[in-house]
Amino acid sequence: DKLKELPVWKNTLVIFVSDHGYPYPKDVVNYEPRRYHIPMLWIGGAVKEPVVIDKLANQTDLAATLLNQLGIDHDTFTFSRNILSPDYPEYAFYTYSNGFGFIDSTGISVYDNEGNKPLIEAPRKGSDLRLRKGKALLQTLYDDLGNR
């Protein structure tokens, strides 16, 4: 509330987003999608009106979304997407120590790279496509990292 009283409040944006440094809740295993379901909160005088955006997204999408709102080019953020764009491809992707998860409007698929098998396919229908997308994205990430 004290920040709201300052003259800079009208141009201030504060973004809260969680990190994954601590396993919480404790009963959740590392690969479960609910471990990676985190909120992002934008507050401040720069936010013109309250709105809830209920979309699948990644933490990496913060860069493109914020920079686009500021009118700044975000093309160098290869894996970031503007979640406010009308043509935003809605999906979430996460990695854990030995695999990945891919979530879209058709469902959730989690893959174990060491065991070379799916751990979660909900629903089973559509899982093959989700897993192919997840594998392609993971390979693209590794290729990008290897080229840096």
Regions found by a protein language model. Give the residues of each.
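Solvent-exposed soluble domains appended to multi-pass membrane proteins
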Residues: 1-148
